[in-house]
Amino acid sequence: MDKYAVFGNPIKHSKSPFIHTLFARQTMQDLEYSAIEAPINGFVESVTAFFSQQGKGCNVTVPFKEEAFQFADQLTERAKLAGAVNTLKKLDDGIILGDNTDGEGLVQDLLQYQVPLEDKHILLIGAGGAARGVILPLLKQNPASITLVNRTYEKAKQLAELFSPYGRIEAKEMSDINKGFDVIINSTSASLSGELPQIDPVIFSGGAISYDMMYGSGKTIFNQWALENDAYQAYDGLGMLVGQAAESFTVWRGLRPGSKQILRELRKNLEGM
């Protein structure tokens, strides 16, 4: 039986084993998937041991995505630009391939909700690893523009410059934003601590689509704020979690599993039904 895993610290609350076990059942793939808590200073040793014991592939979550980027022998284009790896695969020749499926997970979730991206004006809040991982897949959808904002403007500016060869992207100061956008994506973890970005809620005017990468049992504080300020619809990041998992599964097995049923199951669990 082929072995897969997710590495993180902490990891016990990870939903990845649940998701990938259902994917395997759905696609009739014979595999096992476990959660491995690597020591904070012991990721490389843990993942090396996993691959030496017939491990075929793994997911990597916080705080090890940058270490996984360094660990991989070979990187996909999207992983190189993301500067982080959330998916490792052992190729037939023993080479370890590093990939990043986060951005594809986001895009697939938005498209599943029939959120149009082509020729749309997108506002991306945050300039950390989560934002960096989704910019290339978003640009590949040919939006009219992506505007990046961040508490530290300089960080947003550096990201915009990095991705400018791939499409229309610019950085702005939060205080300079004074108009509505078609799609607003919050890539920060502020919702988890009940905080909102210091930006004018005019961004939602005219019926914008709001997307918060965080998720919980109810609407996130960011999405509540969006709906109170004229957003047309608001989605959380649970579907992105399932979408990036589906993309990882496809990288490993060459088969794309369906996500809708698993997303429903996860939502039920979250809401305590």
Swiss-Prot record:
It catalyses: shikimate + NADP(+) = 3-dehydroshikimate + NADPH + H(+). Coiled coil: none annotated. Keywords: Amino-acid biosynthesis, Aromatic amino acid biosynthesis, NADP, Oxidoreductase. Its EC number is 1.1.1.25. Shikimate binds at residues 14-16, 61, 86, 102, 215. NADP(+) binds at residues 77, 126-130, 150-155, 213, 237. It comes from the Bacteria. GO terms for biological process: amino acid biosynthetic process; aromatic amino acid family biosynthetic process; chorismate biosynthetic process; shikimate metabolic process. Pathway: Metabolic intermediate biosynthesis; chorismate biosynthesis; chorismate from D-erythrose 4-phosphate and phosphoenolpyruvate: step 4/7. It holds the Pfam family Shikimate_dh_N. It is an enzyme of class 1 (oxidoreductase). InterPro entries: Aminoacid_DH-like_N_sf (IPR046346), NAD(P)-bd_dom_sf (IPR036291), SDH_C (IPR041121), Shikimate_DH (IPR011342), Shikimate_DH-bd_N (IPR013708), Shikimate_DH_fam (IPR022893), Shikm_DH/Glu-tRNA_Rdtase (IPR006151). One of its GO terms (molecular function) is NADP binding. Belongs to the shikimate dehydrogenase family. NCBIfam families: aroE, PRK00258.1-2. Homodimer. This is Shikimate dehydrogenase (NADP(+)). It comes from Aliivibrio fischeri (strain MJ11).
